[in-house]
Each structure stands twice: as C-alpha cells, then as structure tokens.
C-alpha cells in the first residue's frame, strides 16, 4: 500500500533531541505531568504532536504533505527540581503552522485540544518565545508607553488611577460625580470596573456622557489631562465597536476592554480601531486566574501577557506584589519587563524561559491594582518604577473625608515617594518615614495614614 496503517509511538516522529531550533520557530516550554507509566519522551512528543500536525493514528493523507516541514518537535526535556512526577518539555513549532496576526489561531494550536489529552495528568504552558518574523505580523499596542506619556503630558512618575466603587448599582449621574471628585483631587485616571458594561441600573451611553462631563470639568479646573477608562466590553463585537466609536466622538482619551472574557479576536479588532482613532486602550484581565492559578495546569500569566502585547493594549493589570491578590515579586517583575521592555534576556529565576526580542513593538504599562493604599506607595514606586499605573480603588474612595481628599492623599504620597527616590533615598528602607514626613504637610494624607495603618492581606 505504501503506507503503514495503525497506531504508532509519538516519540518516533515527534521527539527530536538533536533538532537545532530555527530563528523563525515559535518555542514553547510546557510543564508536563504524565499519567503514571508514561515515559517523559513519549509524553513530550505527544504534546508536540497533538498541538501541531499529529493525530492518534497514521492517516494516508500524511503522504500528501511534508510532515518534516510542518510538525511540532519536542527538542528538549528537563527535570523539575523537587518534583519527581513533572518535567519541562520544550517544543518548537514551524512558523507556517500559524495565521499571521492572529493570537486566536496561535492559542488554538498551542493550547487547544492537547490540554484534554488522556496520557497527561496535567499540562501547563510556562512560556512562549515569539520569533521576530511572527511578531512583525502584529500591530501590537495601539500607542505604547512613550506615545501615551506624550498624549497625556505626564513624565517622570507612575500614573495614578482609581476604580469607581461600589462597582455595581450607582446611577450614571452619581457615577460621574465620583469620577469628577477623584480626578479633581489629583488622579490621572478613573476606571470602570470590569463588570460594568451596560446594566439596567446604568446603561453605557448615560455613563459615557456623565464621565465625559466629569473629565472635561476636572481638566478645566486642574490644568492636567485626565481620563476615565470607559469599558467598551459588550456581548457582541458590533456593540463593542459602537461603544468605542461613541467614546471617540466624546473626545475622551481612553477606553477599556476585558480581553480574556471578550476574547482575543474582539480585542485585536478594538486595538486596531484604537490606533486608527487615537484612543488609548486599557486592558483588564478578568478570568485570568481560571487559566493561570494552578501551578501544574493551564498557562502562566506571562504567556497571557505576551499574547496581549501582540493583540494590543496600552495598559494591563499585572498584580501588585503587595496588595490583596497573588503574585511573587521576581516572577511578577519578570512579566512586567516582558510587557515594557524591547529585549528581555532568558532568566529562569524570574520565570523567563526564553530570550524575547520584541523588535520595537510598543510596550504596555503594567497596572498594579487590588487592595493597595498609601502605605504601599514607596514599595510600589520602587518595584514598578515610573512606567506603571498604580490603581487605588478602595484606597481612594475609602478615605474618611470622601473621594477628592482620598485622591489628594494618593497624589501627595506618590509625589513624596518620587521626590525621595530622585534625591537618592532608599525607598525600601525608609518607606514609612517618607509617608509620615509628607503627611505633616497634608491633612488628607495624614487621615489616610491613620485609617489604613493596620490593614494587611496575609493568608
């Protein structure tokens, strides 16, 4: 017959330890936990096969193509220290397997069916190396860090934001009032909560109008450029675009999208619109923990972050290192650099499995948000540096005197930390001292210091 039917060992075809990776290959590092009795080579090869050209049996149509050209290859297997049952499998995928400019297609292949594969107990995608040839097919962030600073005329410090709470239930006018007070007090941005879309108590068009009014009023009074992340996420792409278009007509600087619940296709569409129309795009990562929280299954957030930089977004939530949500410092800083920098060296201590060259794709500002308040300011300034957005929701609106004084307290604390850093002081060592000193000159900050001095989220 010319072809040998039957089930075959994956490792005969897909495990190639002597393969030299090409500059154009997409490389993946998987943490594999095979079922008992499945050898690492077979499991690694199975992952490569199922996420590229393979199927469970030999098919005669294999003869109509060149498998060697199109197959994924497991080219290296390394043990995981302290874990008998796990190992890291490195897989190389030829560039031709993927549609240009489609994060959706990339993920459908690499993290598609293979995650339900019976021979594996669990599978986690730890990192991806995106080759420059593939990166160049993406537009990436609509504007990037430098353009954003120029548009907003804000330099030399992190930007300040605040999520408007209570997240659900306010009327549009009261919502706009809260926005105005925060911006008037000294914040750069306020934010729609990720679950604020267009509900019965507040339809999107009303919210957009009142928020725009708040922005213009605050700008006129402070002489600073202000923004509010208007959440354009919707049930259909058409509705999402309608909201983005209305935001542009109002002349506001920034809109927002929930990229995981909204989906990468919708996100890339919105990002293209934002670049063409001068809107900044703030990205919220609702649902990420469903995908990235388990240590042995799913995918690490650094992969979702890389995917977002390709799909497009100017801000993305990236954990705080200090607040109420999870995140280890070195690992977090690893993917924060992957978002901001142009070239990132492989560094396993920070969870970075591959050297990544973004070939001047614009950078994304990491957003620290979730359970942070004025006492965290020195640590945040030190950890995240200037190119970041620090978001205090409850840490602004929870101020005993109201929203505007809460905003004042945060702005004073931030300016004090930036000044101390510029004078060469050690923020890590003198953190509380810097805040205490500043609070002598700012009753708003003093009140904030008093109310949050005991708060800790430690479990």
From Swiss-Prot:
N6-carboxylysine PTM sites in chain numbering: 191
NCBIfam families to which the protein is assigned, alphabetical: PRK04208.1
Positions that bind substrate: 113, 163, 167, 285, 317, 369
Gene name of the encoded protein: rbcL
An example molecular function term from Gene Ontology annotations: magnesium ion binding
Cofactor: Mg(2+)
Protein name per its UniProtKB record: Ribulose bisphosphate carboxylase large chain
Record PROSITE patterns: RUBISCO_LARGE (PS00157)
Active site positions: 165 (proton acceptor), 284 (proton acceptor)
């Amino acid at each position: 017959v010319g072809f040998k039917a039957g089930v075959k060992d994956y490792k005969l075809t897909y495990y190639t330890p002597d393969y030299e990776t090409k500059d154009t290959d997409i490389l993946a590092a998987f943490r594999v936990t095979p079922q008992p009795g499945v050898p690492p080579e077979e499991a690694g090869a199975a992952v490569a096969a199922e996420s590229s050209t393979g199927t469970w049996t030999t098919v005669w149509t294999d003869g109509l193509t060149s498998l060697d050209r199109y197959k994924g290859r497991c080219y290296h297997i390394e043990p995981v220290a302290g874990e008998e049952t796990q190992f890291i499998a490195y897989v190389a995928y030829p560039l031709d397997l993927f549609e240009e400019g489609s994060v959706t297609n990339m993920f459908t292949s690499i993290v598609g069916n293979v995650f339900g594969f019976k021979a594996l107990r669990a599978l986690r995608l730890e990192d991806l190396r995106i080759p420059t040839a593939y990166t160049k097919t993406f537009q990436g962030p609509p504007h990037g860090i430098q353009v954003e600073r120029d548009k907003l005329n804000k330099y030399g410090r992190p930007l300040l934001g605040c999520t408007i709470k209570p997240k659900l239930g306010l009327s549009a006018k009261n919502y706009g009032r809260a926005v105005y007070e925060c911006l008037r007090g000294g914040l750069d941005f306020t934010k729609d909560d990720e679950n604020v879309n267009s509900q019965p108590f507040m339809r999107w068009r009303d919210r957009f109008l009142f928020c725009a009014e708040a922005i213009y009023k605050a700008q006129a009074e402070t002489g600073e450029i202000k923004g509010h992340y208007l959440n354009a996420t919707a049930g259909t792409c058409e509705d999402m675009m309608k909201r983005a278009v209305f935001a542009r007509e109002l002349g506001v600087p920034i809109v927002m999208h929930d990229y995981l619940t909204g989906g990468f296709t919708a996100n890339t569409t919105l990002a293209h619109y934002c670049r063409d129309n001068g809107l900044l795009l703030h990205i919220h990562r609702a649902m990420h923990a469903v995908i990235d929280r388990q240590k042995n299954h799913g995918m690490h957030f650094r992969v979702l972050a890389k995917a977002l930089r390709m799909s497009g977004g100017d801000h993305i939530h990236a954990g705080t290192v200090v607040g109420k949500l999870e995140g280890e410092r070195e690992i977090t800083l690893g993917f924060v650099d992957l978002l901001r920098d142009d070239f990132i060296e492989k560094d396993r201590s920070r969870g970075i499995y591959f050297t990544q060259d973004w070939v001047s794709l614009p950078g994304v500002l990491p957003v620290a948000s979730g359970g942070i308040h004025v006492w965290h300011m020195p640590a945040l300034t030190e950890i995240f540096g200037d190119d970041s957005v620090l978001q205090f929701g409850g840490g602004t609106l929870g101020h005993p005197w109201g929203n505007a004084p809460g905003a004042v307290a945060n702005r004073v604390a931030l300016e004090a930390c930036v000044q101390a850093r510029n004078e060469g002081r050690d923020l890590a060592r003198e953190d509380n001292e810097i805040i205490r000193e500043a609070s002598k000159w700012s009753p708003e900050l003093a009140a904030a210091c008093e109310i949050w001095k005991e708060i800790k989220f430690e479990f």
